[in-house]
């Protein structure tokens, strides 16, 4: 793990393929050690600040449990719990927290915010999610894929992302494919494709590493032979209702359902989702979607697929914690470098 100590974790393309692989190996080891009761605390005495301008169940719990497992202490600063960007500049917040904490996690809005924190904090800063990138999620996804196809390398795997690919998940998936050599296929309407410049950059790197990146509107062509089909939510609670109708009309044909799974021609294909998922009407937003748009069987994924044996979404959710732990240990512990 040489070279990680005191580094930031802001986006995947900041690292080499070898460095990404070493993080995944460390995560697998930490997971095995925890399961076997052999985990050693390497962060005893460390203090960690968790800045959440956007709430999250999985990210917060993953960072807190990972920190506690490793002997660290955390301070949670929620959407109303800090003055970042309001009464105090990001630059000043970074310099204050950097004097008190050994590491800082940020989950919120623009990538420039986490970049500024990293520039001025003087301690490792980790991106828990920004509008542009979600690197900790992709670490968990890659570990989950390795676990479910242990006999294959990444450049022997085909990952399909169906739906809205112009978001942080689409961008981080491109970066992951660039570093691992995955065969990545973004199956989405053209209006939902990522920025062309990032696609071009990541495709060139993916091809150098034995993979490829394809963008297509053709569902049948895009999912053929897939090992994994991935999707994410189409709408967020904070968005205007007018956008809901527009987004649903645009993406309805890209819902992950039993037909799409069958179109892969792979009876062992697995389903991935970063969660939360609107697969039924048991949530406030899910109920609204069902009532207003007739999406009673699920939105971006049907309940049938979500609850099927092909679904490995809760393995992904667990692996958020193990991979986040690996990032913290690699960047904060001299014992691991």
UniProtKB/Swiss-Prot annotation:
It is found in: Cytoplasm. It catalyses: carbamoyl phosphate + L-ornithine = L-citrulline + phosphate + H(+). GO terms for biological process: arginine biosynthetic process via ornithine; citrulline biosynthetic process; L-arginine biosynthetic process. The keyword Amino-acid biosynthesis applies. The keyword Transferase applies. Reversibly catalyzes the transfer of the carbamoyl group from carbamoyl phosphate (CP) to the N(epsilon) atom of ornithine (ORN) to produce L-citrulline. This is Ornithine carbamoyltransferase. It comes from Escherichia coli O139:H28 (strain E24377A / ETEC). The lineage of its organism: Bacteria, Pseudomonadati, Pseudomonadota, Gammaproteobacteria, Enterobacterales.
């Amino acid at each position: 793990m040489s070279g990680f100590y005191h580094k930031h974790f802001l986006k995947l393309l900041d690292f080499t393929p070898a460095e990404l692989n070493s993080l995944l190996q460390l995560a697998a080891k930490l997971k095995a050690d925890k399961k076997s009761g052999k985990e050693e605390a390497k962060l005893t005495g460390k203090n960690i600040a968790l800045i959440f301008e956007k709430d999250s169940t999985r990210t917060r719990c993953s960072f807190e449990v990972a920190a506690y497992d490793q002997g660290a202490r955390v301070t949670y600063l929620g959407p109303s719990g800090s003055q970042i960007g309001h009464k105090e500049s990001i630059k000043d917040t970074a310099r204050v927290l950097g004097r008190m904490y050994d590491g800082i996690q940020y989950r919120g809005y623009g990538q420039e915010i986490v970049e500024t924190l990293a520039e001025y904090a003087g301690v490792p800063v980790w991106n828990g999610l920004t509008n542009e990138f979600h690197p900790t999620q992709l670490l968990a996804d890659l570990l989950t894929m390795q676990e479910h196809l242990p006999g294959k390398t990444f450049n022997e795997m085909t990952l399909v992302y169906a739906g809205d690919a112009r978001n942080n998940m689409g961008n981080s998936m491109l970066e992951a494919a660039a570093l691992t050599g995955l065969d990545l296929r973004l199956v989405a309407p053209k209006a939902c494709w990522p920025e062309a410049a990032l696609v071009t950059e990541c495709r060139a790197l993916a091809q150098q590493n034995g993979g490829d990146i394809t963008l297509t509107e053709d569902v049948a062509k895009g999912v053929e032979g897939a090992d994994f089909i991935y999707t994410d939510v189409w709408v967020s609670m904070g968005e205007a209702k007018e956008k809901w109708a527009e987004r649903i009309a645009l993406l309805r044909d890209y819902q992950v359902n039993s037909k799409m799974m069958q179109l892969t021609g792979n009876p062992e294909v697995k389903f991935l989702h970063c969660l939360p998922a609107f697969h039924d009407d048991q949530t406030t937003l899910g109920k609204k979607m069902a009532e207003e748009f007739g999406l009673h069987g699920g939105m971006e994924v049907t309940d049938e697929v979500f609850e099927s044996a092909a679904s490995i979404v809760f393995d992904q959710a667990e692996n958020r914690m193990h991979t986040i732990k690996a990032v913290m240990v690699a960047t904060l512990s001299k014992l691991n470098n």
